[in-house]
Swiss-Prot record:
Source species taxonomy: Eukaryota, Metazoa, Chordata, Craniata, Vertebrata
Protein name as it appears in the record: Keratinocyte differentiation factor 1
Principal location listed in the UniProt entry: cytoplasm
Species this protein is from: Homo sapiens
GO cellular component terms, A-Z: anchoring junction; cell cortex; cell junction; cell leading edge; cytoplasm
Entry keywords, A to Z: Cell junction, Cytoplasm, Developmental protein, Differentiation, Disease variant, Ectodermal dysplasia, Phosphoprotein
Signal peptide: none
Record InterPro entries: KDF1
Ranges annotated as biased composition (Basic and acidic residues): 44-55
Protein's gene: KDF1
Length: 398
């Protein structure tokens, strides 16, 4: 019985509200086939069901359950962090090159890679057009491969990573002549300048020397007896021997030591003219350039200074000078200045002085001092007490 004030419902299915209407939602994704219609599953009624209703059909609504599962995967690609990860993966090669060249990925790697990529790209494209259909060969290698082989040949076979950089600075600097000029706003850093040579470092073998690649052997005093041959057929070892001769004739051992140790500037100031004359004579006699002559002269000085244990040859001029002025003493540097002086016992003159009257009186003033002095020479010591040594303890004056 309907309540008063309410109309009687019409016969037919009941009308549902807007919140009760079944809605069909469909999410379309790109590059995916359309989904098939939802399947229906039939379930038999439970035999224990007292109502024994007909078979019940269960329909899976796509707008209620399925979108809740698929929406996270569909919207996952549009998350910010996912997009950044994909962008980093796509730009991995460019960012890697930028990190190697600049130390950081700045402005999307455009300052560091714009100039070089454009030049390399045009060169590769031109080479591909010219050699289209031609089989590859070592003579017709692409520009990038040729540059890599040229750089590897200049560096040697032991270093096969020319593009290694430390904090943006290349470990092995590229040649300045072939490297393009960087842009004004580029983030690439200039390579560090070559360190200045050490002050006390030995001179290295000069590349311009015609005998720079030869090996220099040490020599003994027996090598000094080699016959002097012509300058055209003389070897590097024989030239070093002759320089050794000239050094020992021109300078003393002490002066060569000071030249090698660099302890005295006065020696260089006094001997500048002699050293320059010696260098000029070496260059003229042996047909060497000035740098090679200086290097050989320095090596000869150091070789003579470091071979103190062996006897050094003495020239006749040096012996006559030392014999004429025996009182002149060389300045003491504290490093074995008396070794190898060249004086022998045959050159020394031993003189024995004759006894004078003053020497005889002095010997008589010392009792028991002279050998063979008689014990009973002085009678004043008779009858005095003596100790175990026999020397008198008390002198009695009568």
């Amino acid at each position: 019985m309907p309540r008063p004030g309410h109309p009687r419902p019409a016969s037919g299915p009941p009308r549902l509200g807007p919140w009760e209407r079944p809605t069909e939602l469909c999410l379309e994704t790109y590059d995916k086939p359309p989904q098939p219609p939802p399947s229906r599953r039939t379930r038999r009624p439970d035999p224990k069901d007292p109502g024994h209703h007909g078979p019940e059909s269960i329909t899976f609504i796509s707008g209620s359950a399925e979108p809740a599962l698929e929406s996270p995967t569909c919207c996952l690609l549009w998350r910010p962090w996912v997009w950044e990860w994909c962008r980093a993966a796509f730009c991995f090669r460019r960012c890697r090159d930028c990190l190697q060249r600049c130390g950081a990925c700045v402005r999307g790697c455009s300052p560091c890679l714009s100039t070089e990529d454009s030049t390399e790209g045009t060169a590769e494209a031109n080479w591909a057009k010219e050699h289209n259909g031609v089989p590859p060969s070592p003579d017709r290698a692409p520009p990038s491969r040729r540059d890599g082989q040229r750089l590897k040949s200049t560096m040697g076979s032991s270093f096969s990573y020319p593009d290694v950089k430390l904090k943006g600075i290349p470990v092995y600097p590229y040649p300045r002549a072939t490297s393009p000029a960087p842009d004004a706003d580029s983030c690439c850093k200039e390579p560090l300048a070559d360190p200045p040579p050490m002050r006390h470092s030995l001179p290295s073998t000069f590349a311009s020397s015609p005998r720079g690649s030869e090996e220099y052997y040490s020599f003994h005093e027996s090598d000094l007896d080699l016959p002097e041959m012509g300058s055209g057929s003389m070897s590097s070892r024989e030239i070093d021997v002759l320089i050794f001769k000239k050094l020992t004739e021109l300078f003393s051992v002490h002066q060569i030591d000071e030249l090698a140790k660099c302890t005295s500037d006065t020696v260089f100031l006094e001997k500048t003219s002699k050293i320059s004359d010696l260098i000029s004579s070496i260059t003229q006699d042996y047909h060497l350039d000035e740098q090679d002559a200086e290097g050989r002269l320095v090596r000869g000085i150091i070789r003579i200074s470091t071979r103190k244990s062996r006897a050094r040859p003495q020239t006749s001029e040096g012996r006559s000078t030392r014999a004429a002025a025996p009182t002149a003493a060389a300045p003491d540097s504290g490093h074995e200045t008396m070794v190898g002086s060249g004086l022998s016992q045959d050159e020394l003159t031993v003189q024995i002085s004759q006894e004078t009257t003053a020497d005889a009186i002095a010997r008589k003033l010392r009792p028991y001092g002279a050998p063979g002095y008689p014990a009973s020479h002085d009678s004043s010591f008779q009858g005095t007490d003596t100790d175990s040594s026999g020397a008198p303890l008390l002198q009695v004056y009568c």
